[in-house]
Amino acid sequence: MLKPLGDRVVIEVIETEEKTASGIVLPDTAKEKPQEGRVVAVGKGRVLDSGECVAPEVEVGDRIIFSKYAGTEVKYDGKEYLILRESDILAVIG
């Protein structure tokens, strides 16, 4: 399993099927970049200048919304993931 370092978080992106108002399903080339995902791994947290470690606010299993162009896409064990900093996470859903 991927284990992120520092304040990084591993996300499994949740793809949504996009349709136009008239019900036409858009091809992948016309879709917006996804911004929703599920947290699959969390680093130990951000280290402050004082050396203190600040624990992450998100947990494994959280559904989140993140910045559109944030993170690095990686492929591991046949699946695609996104590794991003906790500061790129905008909200936890639910």
Swiss-Prot record:
Molecular functions per Gene Ontology: ATP binding; metal ion binding; protein folding chaperone; protein-folding chaperone binding; unfolded protein binding
Pfam families named among the record's database cross-references: Cpn10
Domain of life: Bacteria
A single BP term in Gene Ontology: chaperone cofactor-dependent protein refolding
Keywords, alphabetical: Chaperone, Cytoplasm
Principal subcellular localisation of the protein: cytoplasm
Gene3D superfamilies: GroES chaperonin
Coiled coil: none
A Gene Ontology term for the protein's cellular component: cytoplasm
InterPro entries xref list: Chaperonin_GroES, Chaperonin_GroES_sf, Chaprnonin_Cpn10_CS, GroES-like_sf
Location in the cell: Cytoplasm
Complexes and interactors: Heptamer of 7 subunits arranged in a ring. Interacts with the chaperonin GroEL.
Family: Belongs to the GroES chaperonin family.
Job description of the protein: Together with the chaperonin GroEL, plays an essential role in assisting protein folding. The GroEL-GroES system forms a nano-cage that allows encapsulation of the non-native substrate proteins and provides a physical environment optimized to promote and accelerate protein folding. GroES binds to the apical surface of the GroEL ring, thereby capping the opening of the GroEL channel.
Name of protein: Co-chaperonin GroES
Species, as recorded: Geobacillus sp. (strain WCH70)
